[in-house]
């Protein structure tokens, strides 16, 4: 679960991490009022969306008059911001963050994530912070220092000093960074984060460190089981894929893709293998959908509705291995879904496992135009051919 920048900064403030003074605004009038409360003659207005690359995409601007603040805010609110991290539709903008303009001497990068190789929270830092950090990571990875934290010992001050030296900090700035990193580690542990990032972490003209931007990702599992009620209240579903939100309500694992063949599979591994085989035979999956092991007729019906909610789907491949879930239950769900939804695209069904013959017979007796398949390769070939024929 992602947080907006203003939400992440509120979290930072709770842990005494220095941030610029700013206010969130949901109208141009509120933005102008925020600029007045901040004072000064330079303000920064930032679109609040769950995506990086806002600056290069025109979602962040330095402004010098309140008229400019009003005009820029009006141009953002109600529109969609397309960045290199979004799809072609972009993300909707419902709020902006108005902050005071600052004297920036240096831009640094500081972040932390769960390193699955070392099984530890690992800090990353670079003296080359700012909008081009991704290019730095790709072309000159040696400019990024990584420090893994031993979970038994926790974050140690010497690690902060090592990072400070690598970033070229000096004097009181070293102590400031140690304090910031210690607070970041506390947030990471106490709020069940999977990633936290400050880009840029700036050095101001008077030598102070300040988190100019903030990106926070929280472990979905911690939110779902109720460990983080405060974080759960910050969720903004307008920034999430609508189909994926609906899938979560039915405990379905669903990810929207760019293809035209809908896939309904039980098991994440089998789902990925199914997509690979569809690609191998010239098709393009429209989604990843794992209906899970405890599948019911209702969940299968919900899965069909999700797949068909996409305008790009021209065919559906159902690939079920009946281990925990029985093939007759899947067949019952398919029949119910087709009757309720009114499927008008080719549907290829491959069943194998528990009660497979009973399931196949139910599909055959349904009188519906369902295409049976003997194995995964056969199923992939048939759905690709059916989609091509329909086109």
Curated annotation (Swiss-Prot):
Cofactor(s) this protein requires = Mg(2+)
Q: Which residues form the ATP-grasp domain?
A: 9-246
A GO molecular function held by the record: succinate-CoA ligase (ADP-forming) activity
Q: Which residues bind substrate?
A: 266, 323-325
* Reactions the enzyme catalyzes: succinate + ATP + CoA = succinyl-CoA + ADP + phosphate; GTP + succinate + CoA = succinyl-CoA + GDP + phosphate
Which residues of this UniProt protein bind Mg(2+)? Answer: 199, 213
Q: Per the UniProt entry, what is one GO biological process?
A: tricarboxylic acid cycle
- Domain of life here? Bacteria
**Residue sites binding ATP per the record:** 46, 53-55, 99, 102, 107
The catalytic activity of this protein is classed by the Enzyme Commission as: 6.2.1.5
Q: How is the cofactor bound?
A: Binds 1 Mg(2+) ion per subunit.
**What does the similarity note say?**
Belongs to the succinate/malate CoA ligase beta subunit family.
**What's the protein called, per UniProt?**
Succinate--CoA ligase [ADP-forming] subunit beta
| Phylogenetic lineage | Bacteria, Pseudomonadati, Pseudomonadota, Gammaproteobacteria, Chromatiales
